[in-house]
């Protein structure tokens, strides 16, 4: 049975709960409807099922509890508790997530949407500005029948402004919701939140650290646009030191065979050594270059990013030095291959000239749209399982 067929079948939903909470091994089979969050049962000794520590068994009226019931024949890779960093995914899990995302495109095309997450609440805690990530997560939740508790600027308009710790905020918010989507200005904040929470946490960007859901939609987009992931050549351009999207993308692309990455950036924002060392350890070929035209002529994907002014603090002279050095324009398009695409995590400023938008190889708005499907898939898998 494929993941998509599991998703489309309404005959049975199976999940498991935190094994720390009980010595009882149980399973919950709920017929013909998704689980509400009204009841939680616990199981332990679940290694045989590939059950991870925070997986939940959510069930409601009409649920049947059985002892030692077999679950889906899936491995540890399919148990998803949190989405914190790109390294946590293996290739099989990526393929499974993409399969669910494709099924979500059909739901998106249905004007009535879906009610599979009816009764679930998602809390968005955003300590940094966001348009696409926050709105796409909120849209994803609502299109699946769930509801949203939102904070647009938690750094200024929440108890964080009064000095409350992130951990205390998470402990409070998890009492109001079933899943937390967190964007924070500190690298590592999402990992701290996940260690604190007993509900799923999704990292929507932690400072210059990572942005795993963006990387998932990026790889999903590359596969849809280019038709393959093995053997691709990708040029990462712009702010590679502060851009969390390129870090997460590099980690994910390392899962595929015969990939080559090119790093094109001003000297002050070069790719950090930890990424280079990781790629080398995985046998991924990478090369630094100062010639965008040459790299663009070789690549399947030119992944442009903005220079992140907010990360420079008072060193604005360095920002001005970096800004405008590498711009995707008509000259770059002329040397690109016909099948190649330009991608960008957005927002874009002047690093892509406006007339590039009209070229069919400009994939960044299609890329943003794919974010909805990936985030719908993540919410479904984290809250209901496969």
Swiss-Prot record:
GO molecular function: amino acid binding; aspartate carbamoyltransferase activity
Record bears the keyword Transport: no
One cellular component (GO) term of this entry: chloroplast
Transit peptide as recorded in UniProt: 1-39
Keyword Chloroplast: yes
Pathway: Pyrimidine metabolism; UMP biosynthesis via de novo pathway; (S)-dihydroorotate from bicarbonate: step 2/3
Keywords per UniProt: Allosteric enzyme, Chloroplast, Plastid, Pyrimidine biosynthesis, Transferase, Transit peptide
Enzyme Commission numbers on file: 2.1.3.2
Highest taxon of the lineage: Eukaryota
UniProt xrefs under Pfam families: OTCace (PF00185), OTCace_N (PF02729)
Uppermost EC category: transferase
Reactions it catalyzes: carbamoyl phosphate + L-aspartate = N-carbamoyl-L-aspartate + phosphate + H(+)
Binding site residues for L-aspartate: 162, 244, 306
Locations listed in the record: Plastid, Chloroplast
Binding site for UMP: 132-133, 183, 211, 244, 306
Regulation: Feedback inhibited by UMP.
InterPro entries: Asp/Orn_carbamoyltranf_P-bd, Asp/Orn_carbamoylTrfase, Asp/Orn_carbamoylTrfase_sf, Asp_carbamoyltransf, Asp_carbamoyltransf_Asp/Orn-bd
Cysteine pairs bridged by disulfides in the record: none
BP terms from Gene Ontology: 'de novo' pyrimidine nucleobase biosynthetic process; 'de novo' UMP biosynthetic process; amino acid metabolic process
Amino-acid positions noted as binding carbamoyl phosphate in the UniProt annotation, renumbered to this chain: 132-133, 183, 211, 214, 346-347
Stored PANTHER family: ASPARTATE CARBAMOYLTRANSFERASE (PTHR45753:SF6), ORNITHINE CARBAMOYLTRANSFERASE, MITOCHONDRIAL (PTHR45753)
Subunit (UniProt): Homotrimer.
Family, per entry: Belongs to the aspartate/ornithine carbamoyltransferase superfamily. ATCase family.
Alphabetized HAMAP family for the sequence: Asp_carb_tr (MF_00001)
Protein name: Aspartate carbamoyltransferase 1, chloroplastic
Gene that this sequence comes from: PYRB1
């Amino acid at each position: 049975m494929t993941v998509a067929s599991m998703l489309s079948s309404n005959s049975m939903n199976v999940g498991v709960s935190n094994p720390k909470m009980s010595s009882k091994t149980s399973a919950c089979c709920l017929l013909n409807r998704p689980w509400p969050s009204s009841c939680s049962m616990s199981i332990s000794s679940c290694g045989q099922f590939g059950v991870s520590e925070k997986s939940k068994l959510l069930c409601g009226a009409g649920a049947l509890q059985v002892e030692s019931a077999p679950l889906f024949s899936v491995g540890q890779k399919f148990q998803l508790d949190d989405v914190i960093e790109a390294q946590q995914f293996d290739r099989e899990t990526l393929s499974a997530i993409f399969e669910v995302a494709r099924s979500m495109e059909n739901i998106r095309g249905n004007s009535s949407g879906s009610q599979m997450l009816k009764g679930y609440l998602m809390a968005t805690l955003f300590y940094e500005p966001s348009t696409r990530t926050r709105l796409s997560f909120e849209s994803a939740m609502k299109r699946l029948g769930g509801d949203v508790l939102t904070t647009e600027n938690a750094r200024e308009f929440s108890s964080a402004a009064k000095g409350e710790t992130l951990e205390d905020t998470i402990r409070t918010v998890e009492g109001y919701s079933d899943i937390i989507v967190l964007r924070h200005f500190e690298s590592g904040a999402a990992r701290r939140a996940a260690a604190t929470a007993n509900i799923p946490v999704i990292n929507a960007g932690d400072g210059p650290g990572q942005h795993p859901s963006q990387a998932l939609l990026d790889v999903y987009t590359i596969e849809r646009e280019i038709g393959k992931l093995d053997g691709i050549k990708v040029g990462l351009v712009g702010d590679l030191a502060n851009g969390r999207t390129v870090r997460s993308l590099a980690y994910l692309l390392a899962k595929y065979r015969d990939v080559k990455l090119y790093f094109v950036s001003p000297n002050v924002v070069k790719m950090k050594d930890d990424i280079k060392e990781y790629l080398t350890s995985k046998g991924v070929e990478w090369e630094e270059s100062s010639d965008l035209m040459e790299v663009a002529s070789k690549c399947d994907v030119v992944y442009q990013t903005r220079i992140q002014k907010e990360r420079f603090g008072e060193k604005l002279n360095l920002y001005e030095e970096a800004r405008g050095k590498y711009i995707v324009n008509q000259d770059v398009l002329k040397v690109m291959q016909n099948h190649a695409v330009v991608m960008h995590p957005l927002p874009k400023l002047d690093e892509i000239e406006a007339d590039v938008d009209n070229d069919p190889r400009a994939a960044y708005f299609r890329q943003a749209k794919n974010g909805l499907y990936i985030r719908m898939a993540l919410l479904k898998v984290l809250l209901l399982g496969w």
